[in-house]
Regions:
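Iron-sulfur-cluster electron-transfer modules
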Residues: 25, 42, 54-231
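Ferredoxin-type iron-sulfur electron-transfer modules and their immediate structural context
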Residues: 1-71
Length: 233
């Protein structure tokens, strides 16, 4: 990497300012425990310990432009292993948030945009989603004759969320979810809107979309008067 000169001015970078306090960045002991458990350590010549050192040196742009921040799975093994409790997940997510949205690799930002625009990742319309939910409920009645699918039920205890890949590609998986709620004799419902159970904006660092989609979903929970969100993912 060559000789690095650190100045107070250079150290005051967006990544350090945003991630510093929340992630306990300054408490790093450089012990390397984080790197020892990281599944992508040494990819691109990087690991969690090196990431922290680069931020300390004010090398924001090098971090932000690194492919490694996208190779990280955000599994949090490094965070759990760290004796000082440094929140590496927060650091990675913050670094991703500073990458221009159009430069986000792959399809993950497109998926996040779909969620914001259509209330789910797969761009399913309300009509198509409800039709699939009801279709699987009808099939389940062959096994459980008294099963009734509660869609938009007011005052239910549980607001059930769904991974949109299920109604899109694996609709029969929905029956497993239905069976669990039915066997538990739970008060539950699936909403016709904002039922998406995943949030790709969390992985891209798109904080605006992340907050917007969560707030809209929470608003829907309140409209139906549900007490608990059940994330089936």
């Amino acid at each position: 990497m060559g000789k690095i000169v650190v100045s107070k001015e250079k150290a005051k970078t967006p990544l350090r300012e945003i991630a510093g306090d929340a992630s306990k960045l300054d408490q790093c002991l450089t012990c390397g425990t984080c790197a020892g458990g990281c599944p992508v350590a040494d990819w691109e010549g990087m690991d969690p310990r090196k990431l922290v050192r680069m931020i300390h040196y004010g090398l924001d742009q090098e971090v932000i432009k690194s492919n490694w921040i996208w190779q990280c799975t955000n599994c949090q093994r490094c965070t759990w292993a760290c004796p000082m409790g440094i929140n590496f997940g927060a650091i990675i997510t913050t670094a991703r948030s500073l990458v221009p949205r159009e430069e986000t690799p792959g399809e993950i930002q497109k998926t996040a945009n779909n969620h914001r625009e259509t209330m789910n990742n797969m761009r399913l319309t309300v009509e198509d989603a409800v039709e699939t939910f009801e279709w699987m409920a009808e099939d389940l009645k062959e096994e459980i004759p008294d099963f009734e699918l509660p869609i938009d039920k007011q005052g239910a205890e549980f607001f059930c969320t769904i991974n949109s890949k299920q109604p899109q590609y694996y609709p029969m998986d929905l029956m497993s979810i239905y069976k669990i709620f039915h066997a538990a004799k739970a008060s539950w419902t699936i909403s016709s809107r904002w039922w998406e159970g995943t949030n790709y904006a969390m992985f891209t660092g798109d904080f605006d979309t992340w907050e917007y989609t969560l707030r809209e979903q929470a608003k829907r929970v309140e409209e139906l008067g549900c007490k608990t969100m059940a994330y089936t993912e």
